[in-house]
């Protein structure tokens, strides 16, 4: 079974529902974990009782370290800050999960993500650089890596997850600075 985790608030609820639908259409055996960034999202997902989906209330995953930076970040920045922790939340909740893929809530799968995951082989994580077309090359200022689809294994990615978490706790803003932006 493939495990995916995402996070969104009620503004992105339609996107998250579309993500779930695309997984239902393309992936035989999966589970989608959703960190609910507001009570409206938590309530809606709980009431919908979608198969293969577990809503996770934000309050249950916020650590003291995360709460300490929450007030200094916009909602988007706080979501970015949570991203590297989201995989950890799934590993903590289910000790049988061997791999979790973080996926942005606005992703729509047209084919099975297992095709991409097979490329990973025995690697502990799969991190891909943005592939901006020449006419959009200036977007590199918004980050080097494509965060929208990032698989991590439980055992083989501990160090990279910890490093990313630490860096996002330290700095995760929508400010164009040399060599960093948001959760990059």
Regions found by a protein language model. Give the residues of each.
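Glycosyltransferase catalytic domains, chiefly GT-A lineage
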Residues: 1-184
